[in-house]
Amino acid sequence: MSSKAHTALVELREDLDGDVFAPWDPGYDAARAVFNAAVDRRPAVIAQCAHADDVVRAVRFGRALDLNIAVRGGGHSVAGMGTNDAGLVIDLRRLRGVTVDPAAEAVRVEGGATWGRLDRATQPHGLATTGARASTTGVAGSVLGGGSGWLERSCGLAADNLLGVELVTANGDRVRASADENPELFWALHGGGGNFGVATAVTLKLYEVPEFAVALVVYLPEHAREAVRTYREVVASGPLEAGGAVVWRTGAPAGPPLCRVLLTYAGSEEDLRKLAEPLLALPHESQVVTALPYAEAQCAFDAPPGLRHHWSAECLSGAPDDFVDAFCALAETLPVPTATRHTLFPLGGAVADAPADHLVPYRDAAWAVHPFGSWADPADDERCTAWVEEVRAAVRPWSTGAVHLNFVGDEGRDRVRAGLGPHNMWRLGVLKRRYDPDNVFRFNHNIRPL
């Protein structure tokens, strides 16, 4: 480290109310670890910011030393976009405050808070909003990437519920974006991710969700195709409050993959039981139908720490019978025994009803396939990664060509265009030039300045 860099680091330690870690500091390895254990990077400096002013100081520090800058919120990026080698990581995990305004049905969430913290804060008020399907995911990164979750068919995507963003730009300025303040920037933040600055807080619209219930029905492979078709019809004919997923994964402890149909409902257990009757009428191995606090339902798919991950997705125009056959056949090649999941989510409803000017381009998709590779042994890296890509290739005949960027890693510029819409790229590039002309914030699904 040069004398200039050493002096700047000493000054950063003095200036920040949060903590600063360099590779020789105790706690550095714990601070650099991210959700995906396959990502093993060694930043030169980790600035764990305590508040927005710390973020300003960290950005200016990184710019002064010409360091690559990554921004970590929940740390859930499968590609490890919240970290880097030999650069600066601006770590927001200490910015985790959640402030609920029940009268306004709104919540302000700091940039490092997770969905678990938000859900636990809003639940006592009978309120909720669309959030990621894992409670450990960061709110800000999820929302700014679009934000898919159990409530999206009735409440829209997380980005659809965005009321405001507090941002630190590439030159260290603090700005706000909303429908009334910097509206063009606000538009870009409905899916444009971290390209325009560090989100130190977001404000979201809340909805009344006083009751929530789930039905989980497990089927043997020979009954799976009928179960998936039945689930398709239940969702299509049911209320928008109904959602859920089809999830194939290894049977315990290491048996063949089993098909799990999860039917979620933002309403009463009694009403859910009526909706689930066609699924329960099929031959099945086990069933659970119960009322469940929404915050607990959000934890149902939390992956244990320490696993290696690779995942991707395709948005689908529909789920006809030939697709169902192909989807279920792919489960036969699921890497066993691992924690890998082969998932199918329904879209539609409020997702498709957003204004035409909204950024996310997959509004017309009816379903999303999300092969979710998770495993513990590095020896399984190749086969689990290959399986995810095989699923993508196999379902491409039904793909709309669009993709939800929160569901993919670093898959190249064509996938970024597919996730943001080719018709939006010029407009986004112009905004990028205005707010980040040097592409300081490029450890993301990157938009290049024009």
Name each model-derived stretch.
Residues M1-L450:
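Soluble FAD-dependent oxygen oxidases
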